[in-house]
């Protein structure tokens, strides 16, 4: 007997050809393929399939997986599909059909007595997000980010020091060692970036040897051509990434001078629009070069009626400026331009800007990377219509795959960790986020880290069931005790990874090495590799890409906002 579409979806979730709305946006995803077998779907519960001799076989743990997410809709840069997900030893081991191969056909993921189940029927599963622009100002950022769906931090800092409030630099071997020891205790993947503003290499090299996975050149420490060249020379020798926040005041040169100093070498250009910093008014031109991997930070995303007003105060606090000094006011005002902020939304939609990050507590919000990414995608669909390849009103797969890559696979590629994290693919760390479609991008249901639930929406612990109020996010068993060391990863430079650093610092978490940072280009930014010729009018600040004016109106209303947040 065939089930009706409605009955089937209510039991097993949507299948091939079905469309799912994302939160209260105008974005829809359409299922492209279904790996589950009709009539042989596995489902856990009373009177359901995953029982001894039925959907559960007799095999021992070596022949079955530790965890299965059943009937999930996987949303990733490579596709939007329906499948079961198998996890073994904290890593994704299978994407396909789960069940008992003794009695069911086409089983690729075996369920046994040693298998746990997470019911993902009607749910969306994405890779844990990667925030590649984090100021380590307070450790409480970690829980805030986890509860939004972020599972990896890349950045620098030492706490609420003045330098860390402004720059993502953990300066020097001593501070890098301390921050690596702190990272070992936090339930999130972390890679630390050192200070790259120096004209001689010795002080940079010792930071990489101490474990830094990258270096940050920042105008507040000095972003001169000499410092840029020196930093990139060191990066090329050690295969690490250079993140760059260039010279807003154009004191030591203009954007052309910075590009000349870079000499075609790969850089990660932070907040490429410029409100977060960089050559005024035309730093946005850098997103058109093959060696520049451009990103945005979330306070300008998307462009709204409130964006301009809130930036001045943020600038004063984060960069230790004085509103009573005319030159400090001029510095701030030179960075806040309606025209380039408006163009930023469009450049993201066209795939010219490749990544989105937070700039946490330093002109950015650590818990809103994912939220603001999808708000921007919605705003662009409203203002610009469907993208080429999105066939119908209920199919935004091209746009959705473009935007999810901005905070998952592309920052992973940029910083040399895509072999470990950044996508829902076999062999990678099982950092997964489970969403109810109505809460997609806003409030995840479960955050899985290294194969174990690390954070979840949870009701009163004294209640008879898990759901009574007060319901809020709570850290779970995966975030506690020694379990957190088996489910999180600290990333190190190759030279540190191959040394005795982990023993010296007594690090006990999983350790990953960064690799292939220097041989990547814009063309490797998945679904976000467009390289237009960008021109910025120095008087009006209007932005053109290949001669076409790029602009959009500020939003006065956004989805994924007050409807979901009472306070």
UniProtKB/Swiss-Prot annotation:
Residues reported to bind substrate: 218
Organism: Blochmanniella pennsylvanica (strain BPEN)
GO molecular function: nickel cation binding; urease activity
Subcellular location: Cytoplasm
UniProt GO cellular component terms: cytoplasm
Cofactor dependency: Ni cation
Binding of Ni(2+) 2, residues: 216, 245, 271
UniProt enzyme class: hydrolase
Pathway(s) annotated for this protein in UniProt: Nitrogen metabolism; urea degradation; CO(2) and NH(3) from urea (urease route): step 1/1
TM ranges: none
Listed name of the protein: Urease subunit alpha
One Pfam short name: Amidohydro_1
Binding positions (Ni(2+) 1): 133, 135, 216, 359
Covalent S-S links between cysteines: none
GO annotation, biological process: urea catabolic process
Keyword Lyase in annotation: no
Record: active site: 319
EC number annotated for this UniProt entry: 3.5.1.5
Keyword Metal-binding: yes
Gene name of this polypeptide: ureC
Coiled-coil residue windows: none
